[in-house]
């Protein structure tokens, strides 16, 4: 068990306590917050509040949390869309909705579970038992190319390329709004949001983050972009585009909370991956097509023009 202390902001006044806790405590769902309240694990200025308590402002909250149990990664027979594979690396086209590795709340059904079944013992151990072979990640509701290493030498080589930006990742997305320029760069540091611990944000003192973008097509109220990452921060493209006023279509975290009909996630797809092969040093360049949902949305937009 461990305890955290929280002081609500002025903007939190009137918010239900369970909702506030789910926003401010990383990994805590609203239902889990409600259970903590019911079990007396939350105090407000030293007293246990009622389950319907709303933030008044200025109070001090104390939350006692049980230690999270890390799920064990086990092989699972989950179909994989393998784009490239050899004795050193495997590149997969990850579908929307698939989490990369097991974590509290997502104990199985992840890419790691699928890779363990597909590759057997042939995965790098550098990522540890929970993340074998994983060199980089993409969000659950982002689709596209992700690379995993089959041995430690390959993992170290790819991680070095990721650090010096020679492992290039290209994305396509549909962003809300119209861009005046044809291309640009967002250079803004990213860190954990101070108002919602589940979100990232552009914050002073955050980690350096650079995203390059270019316009592929313009539609009424929506722009089709290609984005290239110079760094790889959590939710980077989503945060940067929201920061400049153009959140990704379907992103209910950093954009409009109302889901977009026809989309099960944000319209963001990792279309391209370029790296030097860890064994031969030869360049490898891979692409994968946009998913059906993305294509259907493009077709709808094209019909409006």
Annotate each language-model stretch with its function.
Residues 86, 140-141, 167, 207, ...:
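Short flexible coil/turn linkers enriched for glycine and charged/polar residues
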Residues 45-50, 221-224, 259:
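Short alpha-helix capping/helix-loop boundary micro-motifs
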Residues 64, 174, 189, 214, ...:
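Residue-level recognition of well-ordered beta-strand positions that form the cores
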Residues 1-185, 189-194, 287, 292-302:
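RNA pseudouridine synthases
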Residues 90, 171, 223-225, 271:
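Short beta-strand micro-motifs in enzyme catalytic cores
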Residues 50-54, 226, 265:
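Short, surface-exposed secondary-structure edge patches
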Residues 1-35, 80, 195, 204-210, ...:
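Pseudouridine synthases involved in rRNA/tRNA modification
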Residues 44-45, 101-102, 149, 200-202, ...:
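Thr-Gly-centered strand-to-loop micro-motif
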């Amino acid at each position: 068990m461990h305890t955290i202390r929280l002081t609500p902001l002025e903007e939190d006044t009137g918010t239900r306590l369970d909702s506030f806790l789910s926003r401010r405590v990383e990994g805590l769902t609203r239902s889990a917050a409600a259970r903590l309240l019911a079990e007396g694990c939350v105090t407000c200025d030293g007293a246990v509040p009622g389950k319907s308590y709303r933030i008044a402002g200025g109070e001090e909250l104390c939350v006692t949390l049980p230690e999270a149990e890390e799920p064990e990664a086990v092989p699972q027979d989950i179909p994989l869309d393998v784009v490239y594979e050899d004795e050193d690396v495997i590149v997969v086209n990850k579908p929307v909705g698939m989490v990369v590795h097991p974590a509290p709340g997502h104990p199985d059904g992840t890419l790691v579970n699928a890779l363990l079944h597909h590759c057997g013992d042939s995965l790098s151990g550098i990522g540890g038992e929970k993340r074998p072979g994983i060199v980089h990640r993409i969000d659950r509701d982002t689709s596209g190319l992700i690379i995993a290493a089959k041995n430690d030498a390959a993992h170290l080589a790819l991680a070095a390329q990721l650090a010096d930006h020679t492992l290039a990742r290209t994305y396509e997305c549909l962003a809300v709004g119209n861009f005046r320029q044809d291309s640009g760069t967002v250079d803004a540091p990213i860190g954990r949001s101070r108002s919602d611990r589940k979100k990232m944000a552009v914050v002073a003192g955050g980690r350096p983050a650079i995203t390059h973008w270019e316009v592929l097509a313009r539609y009424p109220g929506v722009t089709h972009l290609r984005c290239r990452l110079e760094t790889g921060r959590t939710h980077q493209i989503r945060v940067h585009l929201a920061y400049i006023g153009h959140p990704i279509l379907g992103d209910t975290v950093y954009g409009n909370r109302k889901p977009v009909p026809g989309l099960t996630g944000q319209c963001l797809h990792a279309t391209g991956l370029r790296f030097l092969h860890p064994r031969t040093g030869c360049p490898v360049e891979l692409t994968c097509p946009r998913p059906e949902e993305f294509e259907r949305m493009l077709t709808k937009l094209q019909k409006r023009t």
